[in-house]
Amino acid sequence: MLTALNRYWDYLRIERQMSPHTITNYQHQLDATIKILAQQDIHSWTQVTPSVVRFILAESKKQGLKEKSLALRLSALRRFLSFLVQQGELKVNPATGISAPKQGWHLPKNMDGEQIQQLLANDSKEPIDIRDRAILELMYSSGLRLSELQGLDLNSINTRVREVRVIGKGNKERVVPFGRYASHAIQEWLKVRALFNPKDEALFVSQLGNRISHRAIQKRLETWGIRQGLNSHLNPHKLRHSFATHMLEASSDLRAVQELLGHSNLSTTQIYTHLNFQHLAEVYDQAHPRAKRKK
């Protein structure tokens, strides 16, 4: 089983050119799947039937996986089994036609303008704070994914024209603009970056000089949010969602927001129209004479 998996990782990395982050996610899901199969004395992919796939989902749910994680596990397994079909090792994909449990619809959380101002109201001159502020300003200004920001190099950024070149999902490149506040924050960071003794061309580096990790960015954002007095947990997703929501509120141009976010499907971007509508509905309920609730 592991031999086939190793060939699959090579296929994803070399032929599909998937990001290391995406491959790691798939590895985690398929490693967990193999453990479940081993408990059932299944040691060959040819032994996997539709019933076995359903058992994997049931066992995963029993282990505490939520709907979104179950869908990810099924997707990872289905893609791998499709690869085995293409390679002629399986005749059919046993995961075809099997659906993960329905996911509940959750609106992404975002911050309002006042919270953004509160978040960024910090003019600390400590080099690590200058770096973190540049990360925050760029993530909010451009709506970058965590993996996109973490993968930026020095030559990815142009503060003169205020554009950043990012590699998104599926190894797709796009150019995204950023604002003057982000530009200033990045220029301030570049002045002190050498103090970290950088070992490569990564735009953002750790105190050891290496490219800053996904986990380190998450932890630094969480710490920054607490220090700035935010009532809710700060994470990269929240900054991206806030960017998308505020752009849509200001422009109503769904296609433009789709391009900026790097969404391949417009349906992915459309969730922000629901978020925007919810905000408008709340304003309506509070303001309209015929909508005000009785106290």
From Swiss-Prot:
Residues 106-285 form the Tyr recombinase domain. Keywords: Cell cycle, Cell division, Chromosome partition, Cytoplasm, DNA integration, DNA recombination, DNA-binding. It is found in: Cytoplasm. It comes from the Bacteria. Signal peptide: none annotated. Gene3D superfamilies: 1.10.150.130, Intergrase catalytic core (1.10.443.10). Pfam families: Phage_int_SAM_1 (PF02899), Phage_integrase (PF00589). One of its GO terms (cellular component) is cytoplasm. The keyword Ribonucleoprotein does not apply. The active site is at R145, K169, H237, R240, H263, Y272 (o-(3'-phospho-dna)-tyrosine intermediate). Residues 1-85 form the Core-binding (CB) domain. GO terms for biological process: cell division; chromosome segregation; DNA transposition. One of its GO terms (molecular function) is DNA binding. Forms a cyclic heterotetrameric complex composed of two molecules of XerC and two molecules of XerD. Site-specific tyrosine recombinase, which acts by catalyzing the cutting and rejoining of the recombining DNA molecules. The XerC-XerD complex is essential to convert dimers of the bacterial chromosome into monomers to permit their segregation at cell division. It also contributes to the segregational stability of plasmids. Belongs to the 'phage' integrase family. XerC subfamily. This is Tyrosine recombinase XerC.
